[in-house]
């Protein structure tokens, strides 16, 4: 992972606290490596499911 990818992952970790899965998904598009895209995608999916659980959708 590049330094830029590490910064994107750190930003996504901050966004996870606010259940902002769509913004994390946008960061996924900015990632430079496949590994970073995978990590960010997993974070977006996890955040989406946490948001659903918090809203009692599941």
Located regions from the model:
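Short, charge-rich amphipathic interface segments used for partner binding and complex assembly
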Residues: 19-58
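N-terminal acidic leader/helix
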Residues: 2-26
């Amino acid at each position: 992972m590049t330094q830029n990818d590490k910064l994107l992952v750190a930003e996504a970790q901050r966004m996870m606290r606010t259940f902002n899965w769509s913004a994390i998904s946008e960061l996924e598009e900015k990632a430079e490596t496949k590994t970073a895209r995978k990590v960010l995608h997993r974070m977006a999916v996890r955040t989406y499911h946490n948001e659903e659980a918090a809203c009692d959708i599941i």
